[in-house]
UniProtKB/Swiss-Prot annotation:
Residue numbers binding Zn(2+): 72, 74, 220, 309
Cofactor or coenzyme needed: Zn(2+)
Residues at which substrate binds: 101, 193, 223, 309
Subunit structure: Homotetramer.
GO biological process entries: S-adenosylmethionine biosynthetic process
Name this protein carries in UniProt: 5'-deoxyadenosine deaminase
Catalytic activity annotation: 5'-deoxyadenosine + H2O + H(+) = 5'-deoxyinosine + NH4(+); S-adenosyl-L-homocysteine + H2O + H(+) = S-inosyl-L-homocysteine + NH4(+); S-methyl-5'-thioadenosine + H2O + H(+) = S-methyl-5'-thioinosine + NH4(+); adenosine + H2O + H(+) = inosine + NH4(+)
Cofactor note (record): Binds 1 zinc ion per subunit.
Tagged with keyword Nucleotide-binding: no
Organism per entry: Methanoregula boonei (strain DSM 21154 / JCM 14090 / 6A8)
Pathway: Amino-acid biosynthesis; S-adenosyl-L-methionine biosynthesis
Length: 442
């Protein structure tokens, strides 16, 4: 492909034929039509599509994967990357993060989300689940970046009835706004922050609203031992039981963390069909002292997927790195090298994540949304290629992603992303201004 052709491949959807790419089982061709879907995939299909493809991409030396799904993050917190590290979780939140967030503006969230989308595109993520503030600005950023997102307003009432009313109205407004966009890549969710920041009344409202609107629920659950103990002391029940009582556990629910779930809670989440987002890097960095009970959740029937959390506590959005950390943490903590094998970790970041977010099946099959990435095998870390899943999980990083396609649109080709320098400059400026505002006496 010539330089001129490379420039032309960006922008509106094009019909693209990817030839001789390895899908993990062997070389195949993939034809993406101009209608945003994978219309054909298989050996030697180039013969019947070569004449209709606007662009032909030589996939030799690359692995094709479904686009990855990040099922828990706070995208705009990319502006807080490196701002506060090596602290106890509650101190980190109360002393550094929440005071800084009090100075956030809609413009900050826009540029922080653009920066996060840029990083995700670079590392092969085509869909993410986001909870934060000024989410109309986040939606604008996602729309312009070209990837998929499930967005919710972080509902926090702290037991205050007046604040709860404001949070309800903010949630309703965001859902109406996103539906008004009529963008198939951007969906809305209800976002009760956590059982320790939202009253039972607020939790019940979110549960009822999600049922009425048929939208997902995104919530933090049992991240630390302290929040579990506090919940038992305050409500005489563990967090998962409280959420169930409030009508918040269903197949629409994505619960992040889950480090301190017990066996009964794992069984309950499985029974309710909940998706649980494992965020191992953030959990280890903030020392939550326990790993997600992965085996118990899977055995119970829960859909276990993968998330990075925000850049303030990770500090990146690279799901390749997260797959490796997840697999290693499970093996180390549970003292069993067979737990969370490489194909399972890959499934968490692809099929399981797509299922949780409601964006297709996370598979490379005819008729599927054209969300896929090409990962180079021509690197030391991917040589030799005895086992594709093993290399992808244990050996390579997101820097091996060369091409990212979402909804049939090429967002990155040969590591080039149009407009990258402007996003980097604007995001850096927004971060600097945010910190200055927070440090200026009122």
């Amino acid at each position: 492909m010539t330089t001129q052709e490379s420039a032309d491949i960006f922008g509106n959807n094009k019909s693209i034929l990817i030839t001789n790419v390895n899908d993990g089982t062997g070389p195949v061709d993939i034809f993406i039509d101009a209608e945003e879907t994978i219309s054909d995939i298989g050996c030697e299909i180039r013969k019947r599509h070569r004449g209709e493809a606007e662009f032909i991409v030589d996939g030799a030396g690359a692995l094709a994967l479904p686009g990855l799904s990040n099922t828990h993050t706070h995208a705009a917190m990319s502006l807080l990357r490196g701002y506060a590290d090596d602290m106890i979780l509650q101190d980190w939140l109360a002393q550094k993060i929440w005071p800084l967030e009090a100075h956030l503006t809609a413009d900050d969230v826009y540029w922080g989300t653009r920066l996060a989308c840029l990083e995700m595109i670079r590392t092969g993520t085509t869909a993410f689940n986001d909870m934060y503030f000024f989410m109309e600005s986040a939606a604008k950023a996602v729309d312009e970046a070209g990837i998929r997102a499930l967005l919710c307003y972080g509902f926090i009432d702290l037991g205050d009835a007046e604040k709860r009313e404001r949070e309800c109205r903010a949630t309703e407004a965001l859902v109406a706004h996103i539906r008004g966009l009529k963008n198939s890549r951007i969906h809305a969710a209800a976002g009760p922050h956590a059982p320790y920041t939202v009253s039972p009344e607020g939790l019940k409202w979110c549960g009822e609203f999600s049922r009425e609107q048929d939208i997902p629920v995104h919530i933090h659950l049992s991240e630390t031992e302290k929040e579990v103990n506090d919940c038992v002391a305050r409500h005489k029940k563990r967090p998962a039981a409280l959420l169930d009582e409030c009508g918040l556990l269903s197949p629409r629910t994505i619960a992040a963390h889950g480090c301190w779930l017990d066996d009964a809670e794992c069984a309950l989440l499985g029974k309710r069909g909940v998706s649980v987002s494992h965020n191992p890097a953030s959990n280890m960095k903030l020392a939550t002292h326990r790993a997600l009970p992965y085996r118990e959740l899977v055995a119970a029937g829960a859909n276990v997927c993968l998330g990075t959390d925000g850049c303030a506590s990770n500090n990146n959005l690279d799901l390749f790195e997260e797959m490796k950390i997840a697999a290693l943490l499970q093996k180390f903590f549970w003292n069993d090298p067979t737990v969370l094998a490489a194909p399972e970790a890959l499934g968490m970041a692809t099929a399981n994540g797509a299922k949780a977010l409601g964006f297709g099946d996370g598979a490379l099959v005819a008729g599927a949304p054209a969300d896929l990435i090409l990962v180079t095998t021509r690197t030391p870390a991917n040589t030799p290629l005895h086992n594709a899943a093993s290399n992808l999980v244990y050996a390579c990083s997101g820097s091996a992603v060369e091409t990212t396609i979402c909804n049939g649109r090429v967002l990155m080709f040969d590591r080039e992303i149009p407009g990258e320098e402007k996003v980097l400059a604007e995001a850096a400026g927004a971060a600097a201004r945010l910190v200055r505002r927070a440090q200026t006496p009122s």
